[in-house]
Amino acid sequence: MIFFFNQIRSIFTALHTPTQQIQLSRRAFFQFLGYLGSCVVISLAAQSKYVQ
């Protein structure tokens, strides 16, 4: 399984410049943070509905 991820990483590295890799990595990171934040907001909204 680790070999598979290493292959994917090498393909990604071959197709993108280091600057592009940084930009894509940052974009993916902030999208992930947005996803987690929306999960928290939805969870809090659902809890407040049932508390009252």
Swiss-Prot record:
Topology of this chain in the membrane: Single-pass type III membrane protein
UniProt keyword annotation of Transcription regulation present: no
Topology feature Mitochondrial intermembrane, residues: 1-27
Mitochondrion among keywords: yes
GO terms under biological process: mitochondrial outer membrane translocase complex assembly
Record-annotated membrane-spanning stretches: 28-46
Record localization: Mitochondrion outer membrane
Cellular component aspect of the GO annotation: mitochondrial outer membrane; mitochondrion; SAM complex
Major subcellular location class: mitochondrion
Keywords for the protein's UniProt record, in alphabetical order: Membrane, Mitochondrion, Mitochondrion outer membrane, Transmembrane, Transmembrane helix
Family, as annotated: Belongs to the EMR1 family.
Full protein name: ERMES regulator 1
Organism of this sequence: Saccharomyces cerevisiae (strain ATCC 204508 / S288c)
Gene behind the chain: MCO6
